[in-house]
Amino acid sequence: MTNMAETKDTVQLRLLSLELLKQLWAGHEAMCQSVTRAASESNLDYSSSSNNLEMPLSQETSASSVAPNSQDKRHVWDPLDSHRGDTYDVAWYGKVNSRVDSLPPATCQHQEPQEGLRPSSVPLLATEGLKRPVSLGGPKGLGPDKAQVPRSLPLRLGKLSKPKVTFSQESSVPESSWYSRPCLDYDWTAGSLDSSSPVSSESEAYFSMLQRFREDNREDCVCNSPEAVFPELQESSGVEEDHECVYCYRINRRLFPEPLDPGAPCCLCGIPRDEQGPQTLVEPVQVRVSIPLSIMDPPHQYRIHRRKSFDASDTFALPRHCLLGWDILPPKSEKTSVPKSLDLWSSVSHGAAQRRNLSATNPSYQALRSRVPPPFWSEPQVARLCPSH
């Protein structure tokens, strides 16, 4: 009798648990439908205000809400196939049912999406959170610690929701309104150029007609005469043939004229200089010379103590030749060479000693002395008076 009573109590408990499970499924479906309906309404409101946001995912959310129902129904088992000793599961189902019954008022309340958040993420997160707490305690015997998952559902909604930034697509602006828009520096430069040439707007028929005209009148359109290269030669046809050609020259550092351009034509007859006949060597033509200022007046002045710093043997420049005269000057007289008296004999002896010093130091003075005869000095004769007897 006790075994029969225990069996009846077990069957009755399982029937009660089955009713609780049905209530749980009904609560799940009601909550999913409310969340889906709220998400669809928010998507419609948000899509009307923005044209570039993504389309509302109402179909996705409905499919995701049906998926947990079908997945959760897999956990329903026949009470006849279960084992004994499942009295703890009934109490746990009661706790889960009470928790789920308390969730719909909080989750079904629709909140306006904050600025920058994607409204379509709300139903996805809600349905994702509803998939996990449905794993009921079956033969494997899940503990009560893992049954605390439904309590963290509002926390997941707050933590996993990340803002998503979207950019509006740039509207295409017609080319006709480009000139009215503000331009940068290079845009202003490109716009100021006259790129609207009338020739570029002509049709192909115009260019074909122009080509046929040039082929028919080739002699008039194309000129092969050398006069076309130098059109100024036609103006010089009235110049007399006996004129003197004028060419441009430049004086080099050695004071020799150099032509600026050997192929430059004459400004009167147009004949290049390199085409002149050999008679110009016998009778030179008139030239126009440009002398650089550095040849006439050097930009720097030469100092006397630096007269040995250049070689003036291969130049015709006048300032450099003048500096050569400093080499043949006699040295300056020293203070000790000044005669101490105006006696004639002392002056003559001092001059002879000075000449000997110059001949020993300066060879040019020796050559100059050989040309000039030395001065002749004679002892003055004094007339003696003889006494008369």
Swiss-Prot record:
Composition bias, Low complexity: 44-54
Keywords in alphabetical order: Phosphoprotein
Keyword Phosphoprotein: yes
Start and end residues of each stretch annotated as Disordered: 44-80, 131-150
PANTHER family: MIGRATION AND INVASION-INHIBITORY PROTEIN (PTHR34831:SF1)
Function: Inhibits glioma cells invasion and down-regulates adhesion- and motility-associated genes such as NFKB2 and ICAM1. Exhibits opposing effects to IGFBP2 on cell invasion.
Protein name stated in the entry: Migration and invasion-inhibitory protein
Gene: Miip
